[in-house]
Curated annotation (Swiss-Prot):
It holds the Pfam family RNA_pol_Rpb1_5. The keyword Transcription regulation does not apply. CDD domains: RNAP_A. Belongs to the RNA polymerase beta' chain family. Part of the RNA polymerase complex. This is DNA-directed RNA polymerase subunit Rpo1C. PANTHER family: DNA-DIRECTED RNA POLYMERASE, DNA-DIRECTED RNA POLYMERASE III SUBUNIT RPC1.
Length: 386
């Protein structure tokens, strides 16, 4: 039995392409050549596949909600957990799940998993070099002390030469960065810099102090720390903070595998499909970390709903819940009086097309047997042919 023969047999079947390919490969691997056996395997696979399909009229949204919500009650409330990396805190459990479905613009602990190209991933030194290029360095992180000198009427920076060397910087680099950000006269005394302004005063110097501390010298903005970890036969970088757009520009970074837990950032840089995949992955990983297993199709349902308009929207009154077409459905969720008052003032009409609004008015819902209309012929007489 050849692959072409199997493809021909499966050509008009209801199986999806991926399942067809997997089935063909399995039959060839097991070296099943008898045609009647192959036909039986294909028939049984089709029957098994059809049994897994959703029945027409099934309330898939309710099933997805209870399938995710019930395990959610068992999740811990721990906000932080050392996720395999000793010095890195990552939000897990229920707080992380809430962050995902709320489509927060900034997670409480943004982090990136940065994979390296073939040239860099096996060499510790090269991986360390990439980490140094990514890790954000400001003036404060390479200084022993930054203070206001009242006697000399200036801001004094005492540089840590060891820190400068370890981050691949020089005193000249620091001076250049400060000059590019602020109009100051700088006096250089080896590892001590005196920053002077035109009209010095205690108030003016203190006002500039936080700005001097925060001046960016090197690396990617928002990436506070990068940790190198060896996994199997390659080095992987874990960052505290996220900036996927700028990290992709760093030499040695594998842009096809590098990820972030900031879903809105993924949407802005890689698009809505990537954001949808990230929502599914993050929810699955969050549940998996708690030892809970939920069918991915329920998670896909939530992700599809959040991304259906081309932007990631939260599930709640500020997103999907507050944008329903039906007035009664919106009122049933949250802020009841507000929605009813607004609708009556504008003269809205509810067509009663959904589930919630039909339940409110006591009508049958369009689900299960309710989605089928039965037509009766009044002229029909028993025994007569139609």
């Amino acid at each position: 039995m050849q692959m072409a023969d199997l493809e021909k047999k499966l050509e008009n079947s209801v199986l999806p392409p991926l399942l067809k390919r997997e089935l063909s490969e399995k039959i060839l691997k097991e070296e099943i050549s008898e045609e009647y056996l192959v036909d039986e395997i294909i028939s049984e696979t089709i029957r098994a596949y059809e049994r897994t399909l959703v029945e027409p009229g099934e309330a898939v949204g309710v099933v997805a909600a209870q399938s995710i919500g019930e395990p959610g009650t068992q999740m811990t409330m721990r906000t932080f957990h050392y996720a395999g990396v000793a010095e890195l805190n990552v939000t897990l459990g229920l707080p992380r799940m809430i962050e995902i479905v709320d489509a927060r613009k900034e997670p409480s602990t943004p982090t990136m998993t940065i994979y390296l190209n073939d040239e860099f991933k096996g060499d510790r030194e090269k991986a360390s070099m990439v980490a140094k290029n990514i890790e954000s360095t400001d003036v404060e992180s390479v200084s022993e002390d930054i203070s206001v000198d009242l006697i000399n009427e200036c801001i004094t920076i005492v540089l840590n030469m060891h820190q400068l060397e370890s981050r691949g910087l020089t005193v000249a680099d620091v001076i250049e960065s400060i000059k590019s950000k602020m109009k100051l006269k700088i006096e250089d005394h080896e590892n001590v810099l005196n920053l002077k302004i035109k009209t010095p005063s205690l108030k003016a110097l203190r006002k500039r102090l936080p700005k001097v501390r925060a001046i960016h010298l090197k690396g990617v903005q928002n990436i506070k720390r990068v940790i190198i970890r060896k996994e199997v036969d390659e080095y992987i970088l874990y960052s505290e903070g996220s900036n996927i757009k700028e990290v992709f520009d760093i030499e040695g970074v594998d842009t096809t595998k590098t990820t972030t837990n900031n879903i809105v950032e993924i949407q802005d840089v890689l698009g809505i499909e990537a954001a949808r995949n990230a929502i599914i992955y993050e929810m699955d990983a969050t549940l998996g970390n708690q030892g809970l297993t939920v069918d991915k199709r329920h998670l896909m349902m939530v992700a599809d709903l959040m991304c259906t308009d081309g932007v990631v929207k939260p599930i709640g009154r500020h997103g999907i819940g507050g944008e329903k077409a039906s007035v009664l459905a919106r009122a049933a969720f949250e802020e009841t009086v507000k929605h009813l008052y607004s609708a009556s003032m504008r003269g809205y009409v509810d067509e009663l097309g959904g589930v919630v609004e039909n339940i409110i008015v006591g009508k049958p819902i369009a689900m299960g047997t309710g989605c089928i209309d039965v037509c009766i012929d009044k002229k029909y007489e028993e025994g007569k042919e139609l």
